[in-house]
Amino acid sequence: MDEILIKLEQILEQRKSAKADKSYVSSLYNKGTDEILKKISEESAEVIMATKDGSNDKIIYEIADLWFHTLVLLRFKKIKVEQITNELSRRFGLSGLKEKANRNN
């Protein structure tokens, strides 16, 4: 799984130097955080609607869009996929209640 995320991360990084009129991702980078967050919000809503109304195929499609736009945000903020997978690994085996309690400390 990490392999496709790493490949996407590399492509998204390359898009930073592309012309905005030639690259959707570059146009998002040029518009900045608010536009990227707007797309993530839209995609989140589409996941919710697909879950309520759609088939599993539609849910998968919409979650792929959400993950993609989340990866765009990560690259925009210079956060690597590895940092996210490291955080998930850190949480693995930790109960959700304990992890939540640790956030307050």
From Swiss-Prot:
CDD domains: NTP-PPase_HisIE_like (cd11534). The keyword Disulfide bond does not apply. It catalyses: 1-(5-phospho-beta-D-ribosyl)-ATP + H2O = 1-(5-phospho-beta-D-ribosyl)-5'-AMP + diphosphate + H(+). It is found in: Cytoplasm. Pathway: Amino-acid biosynthesis; L-histidine biosynthesis; L-histidine from 5-phospho-alpha-D-ribose 1-diphosphate: step 2/9. GO terms for biological process: L-histidine biosynthetic process. Its main location: cytoplasm. It is an enzyme of class 3 (hydrolase). The keyword Ligase does not apply. Keywords: Amino-acid biosynthesis, ATP-binding, Cytoplasm, Histidine biosynthesis, Hydrolase, Nucleotide-binding. It comes from the Bacteria. GO terms for molecular function: ATP binding; phosphoribosyl-ATP diphosphatase activity. Its EC number is 3.6.1.31. One of its GO terms (cellular component) is cytoplasm. Belongs to the PRA-PH family. HAMAP family: HisE. This is Phosphoribosyl-ATP pyrophosphatase. It comes from Vesicomyosocius okutanii subsp. Calyptogena okutanii (strain HA). The lineage of its organism: Bacteria, Pseudomonadati, Pseudomonadota, Gammaproteobacteria, Candidatus Pseudothioglobaceae. The gene is hisE.
